């Protein structure tokens, strides 16, 4: 079943490669801005949640109780607000601002800046953070194959990386979005089926394998849990591989439909992920390896030759989660280097579309190789910690800047540069020096980025403020 699933994903990449031999840079990195509501909505959700929603998050709540449920609460609030407020403006602003196809390109064009400093700074952060983020997805694939099939994790990670790189390398944005569409459906179906069937089996037998620990339902465990959990929602405004979907939708009408699809999918995926952690205590008992509770539930429910096929299909959801996020991250990072460093800085704007496609593909290979090295390192940390670190630096560095660029006329180029640098620096410093406080680094990082962006903008010249304000008004006036 796993093999069939992987072949299907690779087939999508080959299909779009054959169809898009004459495609340009905009088609490869943004789907030509022709994405529909269902594909955009589901692919945004699937690229967001990753295998973490099937392994990392249920594991955290299973191990520590409902105090960690503030994470899905924060995620749902942040995701919903991003679709409602950020998506419509980012789509129209990116079109008016030079038909931008990447986030760094949009930020540079938003201020009519001649300097490429923003693009270069952003691209560097992209490359570093996405390498770490992609490592978490590759690591999840290794855990799955080692637990279910007994295949050594190292071999499994190499195989998964080859498949992910294969269809991303070949098909670009269209292949990534369409594979994410199918993977989003599989993830939701699997997270629904596993806990519900387990509950039905326990109700039928009248017995449970364990009980919930004392205080499990207590969500008011500490102010750090509440603040840090809700702080996860701050990340959405600055998550390039997610918000790039907003820019790719073909019309404002389709965007409104996509928002409903994306928000609805996310609500149910988070709700069932929390349910998995509760059911695991009752159905499996205590003492389970927390990161594999979803795998354990599925394997216990569906046993036997034919039911084993169903088990394989449901467990493919972990592959779906890992692949749907890794492919989006690889493409976002490669587009940042190709469009924001190689084309304007190295080639001085003289590169051809074909050249840009191949540069992007080569960068996909390089980042995937680096991510594989991190994932293969036994000291790289858990899936949860890898996601947490990458999510934090993106949210802290780009979140305030994206929000201000869309909602403040007085925001300037200097403010954007200061916000990105300050947000990233404070996020990393907090992680290194103050992790013991229990406060997620995205919270102080976001606050620092916001403050620096506002102060630097206020200190900018009157001319730069007027230029930014004039373009802001043009963006607001844009209609399909």
Where does each model-flagged region fall?
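Membrane-embedded helix-loop-helix hairpins and adjacent transmembrane boundary segments
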Residues: 1-480
């Amino acid at each position: 079943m796993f093999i069939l699933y992987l072949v299907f994903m690779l087939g999508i990449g080959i299909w779009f490669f054959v169809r898009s031999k004459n495609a340009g840079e905009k088609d490869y990195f943004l789907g030509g801005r022709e994405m529909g509501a269902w594909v955009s909505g589901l692919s945004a959700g699937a690229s967001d949640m990753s295998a973490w929603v099937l392994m990392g998050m249920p594991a955290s709540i299973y191990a520590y109780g409902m105090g960690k449920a503030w994470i899905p609460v924060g995620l749902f609030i942040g995701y919903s607000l991003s679709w409602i407020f950020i998506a419509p403006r980012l789509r129209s602003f990116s079109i008016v601002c030079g038909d931008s196809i990447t986030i760094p390109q949009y930020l540079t064009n938003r201020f009519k800046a001649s300097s490429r400093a923003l693009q270069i700074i952003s691209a560097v952060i992209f490359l570093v953070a996405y390498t770490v983020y992609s490592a978490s997805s590759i690591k999840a694939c290794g855990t799955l194959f080692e637990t279910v099939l007994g295949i050594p994790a190292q071999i499994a990670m190499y195989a998964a990386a080859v498949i992910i790189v294969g269809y991303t390398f070949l098909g670009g944005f269209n292949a990534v979005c369409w594979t994410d569409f199918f993977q989003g459906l599989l993830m939701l179906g699997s997270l629904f089926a596993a806990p519900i069937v387990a509950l039905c089996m326990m109700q039928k037998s009248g017995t449970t394998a364990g009980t919930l620990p004392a205080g499990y339902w207590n969500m008011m465990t500490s102010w750090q849990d509440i603040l840090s959990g809700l702080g996860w929602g701050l990340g959405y405004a600055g998550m390039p591989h997610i918000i790039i979907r907003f820019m790719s939708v073909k019309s404002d009408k389709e965007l409104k439909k996509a928002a409903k699809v994306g928000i609805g999918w996310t609500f149910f995926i988070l709700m069932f992920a929390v349910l998995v952690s509760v059911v695991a205590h009752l159905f499996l008992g205590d003492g389970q390896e927390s990161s594999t509770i979803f795998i354990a539930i599925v394997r216990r429910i569906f046993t036997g030759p034919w039911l084993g096929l169903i088990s394989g299909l449901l467990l493919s959801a972990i592959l779906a989660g890992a692949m749907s996020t890794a492919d989006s991250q690889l493409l976002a990072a490669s587009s940042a280097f190709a469009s924001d460093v190689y084309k304007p800085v190295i080639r001085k704007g003289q590169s051809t579309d074909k050249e840009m496609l191949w540069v992007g593909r080569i960068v996909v290979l390089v980042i995937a190789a680096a991510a594989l090295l991190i994932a293969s390192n036994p000291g790289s940390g858990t899936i949860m910690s890898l996601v947490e670190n990458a999510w934090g630096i993106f949210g802290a560095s780009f979140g305030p800047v994206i929000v201000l660029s869309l909602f403040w006329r007085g925001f300037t180029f200097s403010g954007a540069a200061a916000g990105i640098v300050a947000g990233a620096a404070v996020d990393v410093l907090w992680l290194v020096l103050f992790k013991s406080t229990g406060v997620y680094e995205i919270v102080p990082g976001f606050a620092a980025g916001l403050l620096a962006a506002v102060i630097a903008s206020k200190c900018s010249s009157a001319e730069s403020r007027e230029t930014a304000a004039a373009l802001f008004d043009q963006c607001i006036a844009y209609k399909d």
